[in-house]
Structure formats: structure tokens, C-alpha cells
Amino acid sequence: MFLKSLHLRHFRNYSEQSVTFAAPKTILVGDNAQGKSNLLEAVEWLATLQSHRTHRDRDLIQQGHESAQIEATLERQGVPLDLAVSLRPSSGRVLRVNGCTVKRTADFLGQLNAVEFSCLDLELVRGTPAIRRNWLDRILLQLEPLYSQLLQTYQKALRQRNALLKQAGSQGWDEALWQAWNQQLVINGTRIIRRRQRLIERLAPLAQDWHRVLSGDRETLTLSYESHVPLGDGTSEAIVAAFSEALATRRAIEFLQKTSLVGPHRDDVGFCLNAQSARQFASQGQQRTLVLALKLAELALVESVVGDTPLLLLDDVLAELDLQRQGILLEVMGDRYQTLMTTTHLAPFAAPWRQQAQILKVTAGTIASVSDTAAQTSD
């Protein structure tokens, strides 16, 4: 898979910008807040129809404008592919593949695959459960595009159920409607739980292997999916039964708090180093190592499932890693993955490495191609 060009219109701080990618490695260099991360975010959005930085399309649109466009040309296993997205909060998204509008997000997802790694990913260890759930969901959206419909169906059931909970105690309570939404929550929630659990089972050995390399085999990493619903033997039948029982048990407290307390929207992912919680006990260096292992595992898994090399998006990551881990990451990248990376300076990159890369200077939403010598002068 190779991203050949990208065109942004009124996306974040880009008024109108086209970029042609001419090498397997592209370095976006520039001061902070110039738009380097925004370009990577646009590529990530094409891969997942989500951003790890915001949940609102409105935030992606340049101030003073009503819509934004992202267009990309790529080559996948020798076949050219054109992708286009229009974002307009007033009327929704318009998705196009090879010039044809697609109605279902599942028909757009999976056309471009990318793994994003930024300094914000340290929150995977120390942040809230929602960050870890969203990480799993973004991976699943690429591996199984129909997962997007499953998430939407579950979220609709959750919204409707919460709306009913806010009416609890008032006249006109509809028990039949309540049970109907409970059933939808259980059926679709079970499917989400099983897919997330399977994803963890596939990621775990890959992450463990990478973590052994990165830590010098001094620590053992374990991953676990921590569900509010007892998983039992992991079958759909067992989870449905446990989910239904949990809803019945928590009914009184849910009526009191007027929100849904059971389901995959409350679940978490556990990371342990030598059987101790990484969130509670890992040092900052250990957290960086853990996250790098997770991202390398994600990269390997996406490649193995989709049968093609995903794009690698590195947002100011090298500054967060020591020299040993920088070296491992750069070695893994090699020429195998098309890589877009951002940096404020070129010092971490050896001269031969820079000579093989396309170097782009980003200044206030404008991108210019520069030679290695010019880039060093501006550094």
C-alpha cells in the first residue's frame, strides 16, 4: 500500500494544500502548531473515520468555514484507488471511493490502513478506560469494517436506554420498551465484547514478543480484557446470560443513577508488567516501552490480517524514546512500511537516513518540499 497524494481543503489549519509523496519515508519538519499533526490526522481519518484527538467533525473544519474535504490517491497491490471525504456538520459526511458515493461507512473503511503512534498514546497506559476502548475500536474498524455498524447499533440502544432511565419513576413507564432496548443492548454488546476479547488474544503474544526485545527480556507483559460482564467460557451464550443477569442485578442502582452501568461502554484493558498493574506502578520509561510494544504489535497484526503493509504515522514520537528504542523503531520501519513522521528538528535522523527520505517543511498550514541541506539549515 502506498499513499501517492493527499489534498486538504479547509481541514484544520489547511486552507488548500496538495502533497505528493515521493519516497517510502516522509519527514514533516517544522515548529509546533504549524500543522504537522493535522496532516497525519487527515490520513488517520481516512483509515478509521475517526480521530484520536477529537470526537467532533466540527473540530476538523477550518475556522470560518462550513465544510472540509480530504482527498487521497493511493496504490494498493498495484491497483490505483481514489478516496474522498466531505465533512459538513449540517448535513453529515459524504464518502467516495473512486468517484462513487458510498452510503455505508463499512464500504469505505478498510480501503486505506494505517497505524498511528503519537506522544498522546502514552495515555493508553495512564489514561481513562475510554482511551483504551477507543484504541481497540479503531483497530477493529480497520480489520472488520462491519464493526462500525455494530458500534452504531449498540450506541443507539445505549442512548435509548439511558433516555428511558431518565424517565424512571415518572408516569407512563413502558416496561415492554425497556425490555426491548435491554435485549438490543445485550445482543450487540455481546458481539462487541467477543470481538474486543479476540483482538486482545491476537495482540497479546505479538506485544509480549516485542516487549521482551525492548526491555531486554527483563519484564513480562500481560494484556487482559476487563469486562463488567463475566465472560465465562467466552461463548456468546455464556456472555448473553451473564449480561442479562448483570442488568437485572444492577437495575435498582441504574434507576437511581439514571445511567447504564453494565456493558462494553464501561469495559477496560489491563496491562501488567511482572504481574503488577502498569497503570499504577510503571515508570514513565516503562510506559513508553509498553506503548511502543503495543504499536509494533498493532502494526504486525493489521498487516497480517489485511494482507498488505499499512501506513505508519509517527507524530513526534522519536522525541519520546531513548536512543535504543529509537533505533529499534527505525530498524522496524526500514523500507517495508511507508512512513509519515513529524518532528521539530532533524537531529534524531542520521544523514544517510535523511538522504533517503522526502523532507517537507510545514509552516502555518503550508507545505513545501526542501532538500536535506536546506532542512538542516532551517533546523
Swiss-Prot record:
SUPFAM superfamilies, per the entry: P-loop containing nucleoside triphosphate hydrolases
Q: Which UniProt keywords apply?
A: ATP-binding, Cytoplasm, DNA damage, DNA repair, DNA replication, DNA-binding, Nucleotide-binding, SOS response
In terms of PROSITE patterns, this protein maps to: RECF_1, RECF_2
Q: Which domain of life is it from?
A: Bacteria
Major subcellular site: cytoplasm
Similarity comment: Belongs to the RecF family.
Q: Please give the name of this protein.
A: DNA replication and repair protein RecF
Species, as recorded: Thermosynechococcus vestitus (strain NIES-2133 / IAM M-273 / BP-1)
Q: What is the lineage of its organism?
A: Bacteria, Bacillati, Cyanobacteriota, Cyanophyceae, Acaryochloridales
